[in-house]
Design a protein with these regions (language model features):
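Tandem CBS (Bateman) regulatory domains
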Residues: 1-10, 48-77, 81-92, 112-142
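Low-complexity, intrinsically disordered short peptide segments enriched in small/polar/basic residues
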Residues: 8, 17, 40-43
């Protein structure tokens, strides 16, 4: 199965100059946990709800902080013709739950572990990826 068969095609995109408040509002509106950051149609970053919580709110910054200050630049991306198994491996290796899908340098979709897990044939792959992504860091709180 290819990513184009399961990817979400209706996706929001932010500019690096947008605020984290706008990012949070879009996440709420689209009911998602991450939004790609684009310059024209090219993906230059990704911002997640976790980025906002840890890199903005937890350090006392307000909602007017620019997305570029908290986003992950140059995110890992997939392509529409990538096999789902390859995407799961890529997500596992990079410990990411969401993968922007790019074709000819343009954002065309998004795939999450949730998209993969709802496909009956792919549930085991999604479970494996989630286990790998969710491994706790050793002695994180000691």
């Amino acid at each position: 199965m290819k990513l184009k068969d399961i990817m979400s095609r209706e996706i929001a995109c932010l500019s690096a100059e947008d605020t984290v408040e706008k990012a949070a509002q879009l996440m709420k509106s689209y009911n998602v946990g991450s939004i790609p950051v684009c310059a024209q149609d090219s993906v230059v970053g990704i911002i997640t709800d976790r980025d906002i919580a840890l890199r903005a709110i937890a350090v006392g910054d307000d909602g007017y902080l620019q997305v570029k200050k908290v986003m992950t630049a140059n995110p890992v991306v997939g392509t529409p013709d990538m096999d789902v198994d390859d995407a799961v491996r890529l997500m596992s290796e990079n410990q990411i739950r969401r993968l922007p899908i790019v074709e000819n340098n343009s954002l065309v979709g998004m795939v999450s572990l949730g998209d993969i897990s709802v496909e009956p044939k792919l549930q085991e792959d999604a479970e494996t990826a989630l286990k790998n992504i969710s491994k706790p860091a050793a002695n994180r709180f000691s």
